[in-house]
Amino acid sequence: DVAPSRGLGDVYKRQDEYFEKVQDSNLMQNKEGGTYRPTFYCLRDNKTSLLWMVPLSSRVEKFKAIHDKQVAKYGKCLTIVLGEFDGKEAAFLLQNMFPIREYYLDHIHTRNNNPVPVKHSIHREVTTRMKKIRQLHSRGKKVVFPDIDRLEQIMLAEVKDNATE
């Protein structure tokens, strides 16, 4: 059900317009100190055509500590995947994932004008965990910080409005 958006491992920046539109204080801000951050790993939901954005963080030590605490307590950590992106360690923050329309994507993350892919093993892990998180969420478990039901409804309403225009 969840597949890469335009190819395996596409990573994007998000437009400020999305943040202004949805007004969710639990979404990660777009800019830190004037630079484009965070970057988002992008997966398409084939049922709705919406994209699910998973923020990447370079603050690996911070999220490794949270990850390790979850593993010690529960035997696993569903919401943070530790891995590599663009030659650097990164934390994929499923706890901060959210739905978006392709319209709100700003630009793809590139190196030397080529899209930077996410390793297939990380893609598999993120995809598997995202499915589990969405299943837990559908059963009423609060697993992610943003209000993904509200955000999904806003995006689906836009898709519907654009289809009738």
Which residues does each predicted region cover?
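Single conserved hydrophobic/aromatic residue that forms the stacking wall/gate
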Residues: 1-9
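A residue-level signal for beta-strand positions that form part of recognition/binding surfaces
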Residues: 9-10, 50, 91
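An N-terminal domain-cap segment
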Residues: 13-35
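Residues at the C-termini of beta-strands that transition into short coil/loop
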Residues: 15, 57, 101
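Residue-level detector of flexible, active-site-proximal loop/helix-junction positions
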Residues: 18-19, 60, 104
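Compact nucleic-acid interaction/catalytic patches
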Residues: 32-36, 46-84
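Short beta-strand-centered aromatic/proline hotspots
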Residues: 39-43
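C-terminal terminal-subdomain/extension
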Residues: 67-165
